[in-house]
C-alpha cells in the first residue's frame, strides 16, 4: 500500500495526465507530494512545445517552477525529432518527421524504460491516459504501480494533499475524456506474462 511518506518517483507516461491536471487546476498539488516527477522529452514537447495549445503555457511555467523536482529525461528519439523540427527539411524529411511524430512518444518511452531505474526508492508510480502505455510497462525490470489520472486524483485526496482533487478532476470530465479509475501493481519478480494489466481501483 502506497503512503504519502513513500518517495516513489512519478512517471508521467503520456500527455494526457498533465493536460487534464492542468485543466482541473491540480498542477500545483504535485509539489505537495514531495516526489520527483519524470517527464520524457517527447511528452514534454507534446504538452508544452507549442504554447498556443490549451494549457501549454501553464504546464511550461509549472515545469520551470518545479526546477530539479522534474526530471526532464532526454532520449535519442526526442533529440532526433527536435533536430528535424529545427532545421530546414527536404520533402522526404517532412514525411519522416510526420511519421516520427506519430510514434515518437511511445518509442521515446520505450527507450527511456530500457535505461532508467528509480534511484532513491525501489519502485515507481506511473500515471497514464494512453491505452498503449500499460503494455510497455509490463516489461519493466523494477516494481511499479500503474494508474490512470482518475486513480491518481483519488490517491492524492486520500493522502490529504488536496481534499478537492477528485471533484476538481470530475468537473472537467465533460470536456476531457478520462479513463476510469484503474490501477495495477507490477511485481518485477513475476514472469512478464503473469503481470496484470490495470483493473478497477477499489480505494484500498
Describe every region a protein language model picked out.
Residues 1-11, 21-22, 27-76, 83-91, ...:
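Feature 3881 marks metal-assisted phosphotransfer/nuclease machinery
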Residues 13, 127-128:
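Short beta-strand scaffold positions
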Amino acid at each position: 500500500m502506497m503512503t504519502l511518506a513513500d518517495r516513489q518517483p512519478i512517471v508521467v507516461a503520456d500527455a494526457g495526465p498533465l493536460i487534464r491536471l492542468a485543466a482541473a487546476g491540480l498542477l500545483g498539488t504535485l509539489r505537495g507530494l514531495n516526489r520527483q516527477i519524470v517527464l520524457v522529452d517527447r511528452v514534454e514537447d507534446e504538452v508544452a512545445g507549442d504554447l498556443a495549445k490549451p494549457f501549454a503555457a501553464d504546464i511550461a511555467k509549472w515545469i520551470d517552477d518545479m526546477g530539479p523536482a522534474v526530471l526532464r529525461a532526454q532520449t535519442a528519439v526526442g533529440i532526433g525529432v527536435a533536430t528535424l523540427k529545427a532545421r530546414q527539411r527536404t520533402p522526404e524529411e517532412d514525411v519522416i518527421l510526420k511519421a516520427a511524430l506519430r510514434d515518437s512518444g511511445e518509442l521515446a518511452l520505450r527507450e527511456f524504460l530500457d535505461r532508467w531505474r528509480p534511484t532513491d526508492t525501489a519502485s515507481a508510480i506511473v500515471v497514464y491516459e494512453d491505452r498503449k502505455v500499460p503494455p510497455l510497462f509490463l516489461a519493466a525490470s523494477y516494481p511499479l504501480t500503474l494508474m490512470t489520472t482518475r486513480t491518481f486524483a483519488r490517491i492524492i485526496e486520500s493522502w490529504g494533499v488536496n481534499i478537492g482533487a477528485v471533484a476538481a478532476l470530475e468537473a472537467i470530465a465533460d470536456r476531457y475524456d478520462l479513463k476510469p479509475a484503474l490501477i495495477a501493481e507490477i511485481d518485477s519478480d513475476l514472469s512478464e506474462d503473469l503481470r496484470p494489466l490495470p483493473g478497477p481501483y477499489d480505494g484500498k
